[in-house]
Amino acid sequence: MSREIRPSSLDHVALWVDERQALASFLCDHLGMHVIEETDTFTLVGVDAKLGKLTLFDAEGPRERGSIEYIALRVKDLEAVVAGLPEGSAVDGIARFEGPGGVPLALVEGRGVDFDLDHVVLRLPDREGALAELEEMGFERRDGVLAVGDRELHIVDGDAADGERPLLNHLALLVDSADEVQRDAEERGVEIDDVKDAPNTLAVFLRGPSGVRIEYVEHKPGFALV
């Protein structure tokens, strides 16, 4: 990817889920989120539309975790938040638990807005190769992990086989211009997986290591989600 195209944020994580309503309710009731947008096929939740979000797409279950180890949200007072969960406990600064549909979640103590996205952990074969490929796709390598802005992507060695019912749909990076990403990919002979032109956003999808889909999303002028 051209060095002139630098994503500014890990905007959201999109999942295929078989308990969309139950998971959305859990995230809103226990993890400080609210419904930002909802359609017949997906629900977008987060603490703020301009912070890290989760997109929940309807899919048949059960889903296979495959490449996704867990999704971590940050909070200022880990013990207090964990005490309010139906189950879970903090060990060595992290509390891991499952949401409805077996979605692997975690809480870590950190600065910033409570329940904003902190990091995602993916399990992929050939960790070093995956790190190098994702760095080429716009992530920045910092102390053995990948980062965009103040959010991180961690890669651990493991089997990424998702079977026919993967949990992970895609990871989304916020960019100034999705058109520039598309032009850059075409000039380099990189296959475009998909392009979506929505009322608030324009997005280009590429494939990363082990087929992980990376979305480059541009917020259009007047981006109106809250």
Model region roles, listed by residue range:
Residues S2-R6, V82-L122, R142-D159, Q182-V226:
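Vicinal oxygen chelate
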Residues Q21-D29, H34-E37, T55-A59, R63-E109:
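Extended, hydrophobic interaction surfaces within ordered domains
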Residues G52-T55, R63-E64, L153-V156, E164:
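Short loop/beta submotifs within extracellular cysteine-rich repeat domains
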Residues T39, P62-R63, D162, K196-P199:
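A short beta-turn/loop motif at secondary-structure boundaries
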Residues S2-S8, A14-L54, A80, L122-L153, ...:
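Core segments of cupin and vicinal oxygen chelate
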Residues L10-H12, G66-I71, L117-H119, P166-L171:
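Eukaryotic phosphotyrosine signaling hubs
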Residues E19, G99, D126, S177, ...:
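Acidic di-acidic motifs
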Residues W16, A72-R74, V121-R123, A172-D176, ...:
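Short hydrophobic/aromatic beta-strand micro-patches
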